[in-house]
Amino acid sequence: MKHLSLILLLASFTANSSDLSAPQAAAEKFFRYFNAKDIESLNNASGRPFIFAAGGEVIRWNSYGEALDFEALEESGWAYSRIHQNELIYKDDMTAMVDINFSRYDSTDAVITTSDVIYLFVNRDGAWKIKSAFVKGNLTLGR
């Protein structure tokens, strides 16, 4: 019940999806899947392979789910993430780039970290999928 209340609260803070482009709405949905720790939905919402660039290191994962370790994230104190800024930088028929500023929070709603990430989206059969994440600075997915 606590997690359901948290998800509903977070949903109320996000921008109205009718105000967002399709790639921006896909980013919002991706964060909802992340907060729900729904690896299957995260994999379905991302391209393969998934490229993660952070702290000067570029890693290629077969799927987004392979890059994640929710247990390690929770051990670091992570309880949920919230988007603060969701800005479309570029979009054509096949690709888009979205600049996201977000924070990770602990269970007391204290900020653990705030990050800026540019996500590259690809349009596959009408669905926008996150293909790559370019982090300004350091950020971990738990691995």
Which ranges hold each PLM region?
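A short gly/proline-enriched turn/hairpin at secondary-structure junctions
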Residues: S46-W61, S76
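Hydrophobic pocket/interface hotspot
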Residues: F30, S41-L42, F50, V98, ...
